């Protein structure tokens, strides 16, 4: 614990050179020190921090300032119209005691169940802001390994409108760093997120609308950004898609899976997603579009532009069959059980140290992909494009070198540029 605090504090010092306090007295400002917080890294400050947040909420909102120090804390709940502002040298450190994270209802892996409340949470609270600079450290590994009930996440916002996360860093989180559920008009900007191990997602966007993620540096043990909308019949009936998502000017990396994952929890659907002006690298895929038999839902209107893809076995992975594994909670109906994918396009992409441009053979013939366009793809790769069961495919200006075998390999695919000659 002490070593993690020292490492994290040193990182924050290097990232933010300013030493000016964010806690100068002003109307509507609530200093956690005034409510008894010690910030010594030893005393549990949970009660004092929550008391400050409650006082701010009772006043109708304001600014809760966290001055320099290391604040050891359990779960905290932020109210409406509250801005939590961290000093550049303020560190929030998750408690190692599971009793400091009460059991609540959560959606985890697409299903509603019991889980431990996140280190920082807000529910049904509009106009919540968390502002850096400053750093938030997740609970220890032992808590993050909890699966049933789910261990504590770092930040979880549920049914929140107009939430903003800006300018802070997170460290050593073993589960999802940020989970957004049923949120609208959300912005994440200038965040630096780091996590370890599988399940250490960066930002999970779950049945949310109008989301912007910009100028973030996310390097995780699992998916850097994951787009979800629940799974099974309950999520399909609920019908709350993730939609209108913009990801721009970000650096996204995953040491285990994908820089950007779409699915497999997508029974509510995912649509209108833009990713632009980003650099991506993934241990398995830079971008992974995934589902399985029985999951249902849809992926539609997903576009990518001006992307740099580095050190990834695959630029785009498409897998809707999951090695034949059927969903344990299938959406009923032969037509409805297959995920629909339509109107997906990528333009002006630079690939480097990428094994394969597209791995897209795991698609059901019962629900072919409808509309996939790749334009202006340059760089080097070992293999080209593999597609199965797709229509209205357009390949234009794919000027890659270094590959072996055919540039384009297809099975039951209709479209333009499929012979591998017109595209170069």
Regions found by a protein language model. Give the residues of each.
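Positively charged n-region of N-terminal signal peptides that target proteins for export
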Residues: 1-4
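Extracellular/periplasmic carbohydrate-active domains that bind, remodel
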Residues: 14, 23-424
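Bacterial N-terminal signal peptides
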Residues: 8-18
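Short amphipathic alpha-helical "recognition" segments used for binding
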Residues: 6-7, 54
């Amino acid at each position: 614990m002490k070593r993690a605090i020292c490492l994290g504090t040193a990182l924050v010092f290097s990232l933010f050179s300013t030493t000016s306090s964010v806690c100068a007295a002003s109307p509507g400002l609530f200093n956690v020190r005034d409510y008894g917080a010690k910030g010594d890294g030893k005393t549990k400050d949970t009660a004092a921090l929550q008391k400050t947040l409650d006082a701010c909420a009772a006043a109708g909102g304001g600014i809760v300032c966290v001055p320099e120090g290391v604040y050891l804390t359990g779960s905290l709940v932020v109210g409406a119209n509250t801005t939590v502002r961290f000093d550049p040298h303020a560190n929030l450190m998750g408690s190692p005691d599971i009793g400091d994270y009460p059991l609540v209802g959560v959606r985890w892996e697409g299903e509603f169940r019991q889980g431990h409340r996140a280190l920082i949470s807000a529910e049904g609270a509009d106009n919540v802001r968390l502002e850096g600079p400053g750093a938030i450290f997740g609970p220890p590994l032992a808590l993050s390994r909890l699966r049933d009930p789910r261990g504590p996440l770092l930040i979880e916002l549920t049914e929140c409108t107009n939430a903003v996360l800006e300018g802070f860093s997170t460290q050593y989180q073993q589960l999802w760093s940020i989970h957004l559920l049923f949120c609208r008009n959300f912005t994440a900007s200038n965040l630096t997120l780091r996590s370890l191990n599988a399940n250490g997602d960066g930002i999970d966007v779950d049945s949310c609308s109008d989301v912007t993620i910009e100028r973030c540096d996310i390097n995780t043990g699992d998916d850097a950004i994951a787009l979800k909308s629940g799974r099974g019949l309950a999520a399909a009936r609920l019908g709350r898609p993730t939609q209108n998502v913009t990801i721009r000017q970000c650096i996204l990396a995953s040491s285990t899976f994908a820089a950007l994952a779409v699915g497999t929890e997508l029974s509510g659907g995912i649509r209108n997603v833009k990713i632009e002006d980003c650099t991506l690298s993934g241990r398995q895929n830079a971008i992974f579009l995934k589902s399985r038999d029985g999951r249902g839902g849809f992926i539609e209107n997903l576009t990518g532009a001006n992307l740099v893809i580095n050190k990834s076995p695959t630029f785009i992975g498409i897998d809707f069959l999951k090695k034949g594994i059927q969903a344990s909670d299938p959406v009923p109906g032969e037509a409805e059980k297959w995920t629909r994918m339509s109107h997906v396009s990528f333009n002006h992409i630079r690939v480097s140290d990428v094994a394969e441009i597209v791995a897209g053979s795991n698609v059901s013939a019962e629900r072919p992909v409808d509309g996939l366009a790749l334009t202006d793809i340059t760089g080097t790769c070992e293999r080209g494009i593999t597609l199965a069961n797709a229509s209205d495919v357009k390949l234009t200006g794919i000027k890659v070198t270094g590959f072996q075998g055919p540039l384009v390999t297809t099975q039951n695919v209709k479209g333009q540029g499929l012979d591998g000659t017109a595209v170069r």
